């Protein structure tokens, strides 16, 4: 098992499994599984995505293996702004983006076109995958948490905290 860059979990490239220090519903990216399959496959693991609710409200298609998930672009923006605004914990120390992540392109689970791997254009050093055809965003486990905990102004707070 090797550590995943900038994250707190590990990945075994041999068997494509992951080891997480917390449960799926014990982070800023708390996902509650509904038990329903989607008919789409995870772009990382090629296992069937499932329906879940992110932080008790937004429905996402997620992977039980790698804990990545797909959400539409507009919903992603709303989630990031809302959760950053509500966060009151300690900021993460800034870390640079791993340039290798920009070459790690995924296939959109909906249309099967290649997604665009690019830096998230907001706080946090995160590379996200976007589909220009479907307007979907793929987030690997922990990426939304890094955006939430990134230093900088928080929406709804004129003092930046």
What are these regions (language model features)?
Residues 1, 11, 18-19, 69-71, ...:
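Short, structured motif recognition centered on aromatic/hydrophobic residues
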Residues 1-41, 156-161:
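Intrinsic N-terminal pre-sequences and regulatory tails
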Residues 1-6, 29-38, 52-57, 95-105, ...:
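Short, flexible, mixed-charge glycine/proline-rich loop motifs
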Residues 6-13, 24-30, 54-60, 75-80, ...:
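Short cysteine/histidine-rich zinc-coordinating motifs and their immediately flanking basic loops
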Residues 9, 39, 60, 68, ...:
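Residues immediately within or flanking Cys/His clusters that coordinate Zn2+
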Residues 12-15, 42-45, 63-66, 108-111, ...:
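Short cysteine-rich clusters marking metal-coordination/redox-active sites
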Residues 20-29, 44-50, 85-96, 111-118:
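Short Cys/His-rich Zn2+-coordinating modules
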Residues 25-33, 75-99, 148-161:
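Short, intrinsically disordered terminal segments enriched in charged and Pro/Gly residues
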């Amino acid at each position: 098992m090797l550590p995943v860059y900038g994250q707190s979990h590990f990945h075994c490239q041999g068997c494509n499994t992951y080891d997480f220090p917390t449960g799926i519903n014990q982070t800023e990216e708390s996902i509650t599984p509904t038990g329903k399959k989607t008919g789409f496959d995870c772009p990382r693991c090629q296992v069937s995505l499932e329906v879940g609710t992110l932080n008790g409200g937004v429905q996402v298609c997620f992977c039980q293996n790698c804990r990545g998930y797909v959400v539409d672009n507009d919903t992603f923006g709303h989630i990031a702004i809302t959760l950053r605004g509500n966060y009151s914990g300690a900021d993460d120390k800034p870390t640079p983006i791993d340039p290798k992540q920009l070459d790690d392109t995924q296939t959109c689970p909906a249309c099967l076109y290649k997604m665009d791997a690019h830096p998230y254009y907001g706080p946090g050093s995160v590379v996200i995958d976007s589909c220009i055809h479907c307007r979907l965003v793929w987030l690997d486990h922990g990426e939304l948490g890094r955006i939430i905990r990134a230093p900088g102004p928080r929406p709804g707070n004129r003092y930046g905290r």
